[in-house]
Curated annotation (Swiss-Prot):
Gene symbol of the encoding locus: RPS1
Lineage top rank: taxon: Eukaryota
KW Ubl conjugation (keyword) present: no
Induction behaviour: By heat stress (at protein level).
Matches recorded under InterPro entries: NA-bd_OB-fold, Ribos_protein_bS1-like, S1_domain
Protein name: Small ribosomal subunit protein bS1c
Low complexity composition-biased segments: 9-21
Gene disruption phenotype: Reduced plant size and pale green leaves.
Keyword annotations: Acetylation, Chloroplast, Plastid, Repeat, Ribonucleoprotein, Ribosomal protein, RNA-binding, Transit peptide
Organism: Arabidopsis thaliana (Mouse-ear cress)
Chief localization: plastid
Cross-referenced Gene3D superfamilies: Nucleic acid-binding proteins (2.40.50.140)
Protein family membership: Belongs to the bacterial ribosomal protein bS1 family.
CDD domains, sorted: S1_RPS1_repeat_ec2_hs2, S1_RPS1_repeat_hs4
Amino acid sequence: MASLAQQFSGLRCSPLSSSSRLSRRASKNFPQNKSASVSPTIVAAVAMSSGQTKERLELKKMFEDAYERCRTSPMEGVAFTVDDFAAAIEQYDFNSEIGTRVKGTVFKTDANGALVDISAKSSAYLSVEQACIHRIKHVEEAGIVPGMVEEFVIIGENESDDSLLLSLRNIQYELAWERCRQLQAEDVIVKAKVIGANKGGLVALVEGLRGFVPFSQISSKAAAEELLEKEIPLKFVEVDEEQTKLVLSNRKAVADSQAQLGIGSVVLGVVQSLKPYGAFIDIGGINGLLHVSQISHDRVSDIATVLQPGDTLKVMILSHDRDRGRVSLSTKKLEPTPGDMIRNPKLVFEKAEEMAQTFRQRIAQAEAMARADMLRFQPESGLTLSSDGILGPLGSELPDDGVDLTVDDIPSAVDI
């Protein structure tokens, strides 16, 4: 279709001839008789006016036709129409069923949630409640910012604008249950924070899930209120995602931890409290006593000058009474030089494993000597202790028939 400028460019009046201009001048200077006949110039002007009128009528009709086309068929001649776009969207295979996982890109966030581009007809919405397995006030607390690409799950549809509703929380729940099943299979000890209590036991947060710890499965005699907001060691007893049932035991965790507390082993602990006679140290959910006499070879008159609640330190297991649940600890045995725990505790912790190894070797030698002394009176074992203290086969130091000890030779317990 020609443009309006092109249309109007053709509407030009023909220039008047020189004879016509002279005739006009003559008519002004020499008025003619009104009754005279019409001149040829006037006839030509009338004819020209009729031609212009015809062009104007054609132009008017052209505009009317264009208007009618715009009114009845506005998209005629356009290569890709709105209807074509809608048809293309319908042909796009996008699964919007609830439970479907989709990949999306966050492009806007606010205090209430986030808008996510999932390549659908419209943007999807992620509310702050569905953004994380933990309670948060803003999606950015869960690391959700514009530009983040993540996998979401469709949980519904907004009826007001047909936009899809997304969730990250549901995906995180599935991963949390899977992780708990894995930890149960591996029979490992986990630390969990106590967040509540009821008539039956404690409620602890494990991998973002609320787990139940029956009072019968708690090793500590402390009241439930004393354990609130504290971390305790736990082992999995039952993990049932279908029934949303997660049961744990503190007693089993403590028992397993105690089994690993060998004499001479070095463990990491946290100072819980100070008493005049020593410091109580938390070593993986078990409270051990670091007696004031076992802090350093040098005398410690005030424990607070060496330790403070919350301090992290390395301690060595000195003794462990499993029946009574008592553990004695020592940093004194870890000192490279007497008094280092007071002057340079950092050096003590750096050399802890090395000093503990020396301690264990001395213990092993002492136990070997004790067994050898017992074997001196048991020649039937075929072993004896030589004069230089080495345990070996029975030699000539003892007669082949052993040592004949009569009852009179054995001292009584009173004499001892």
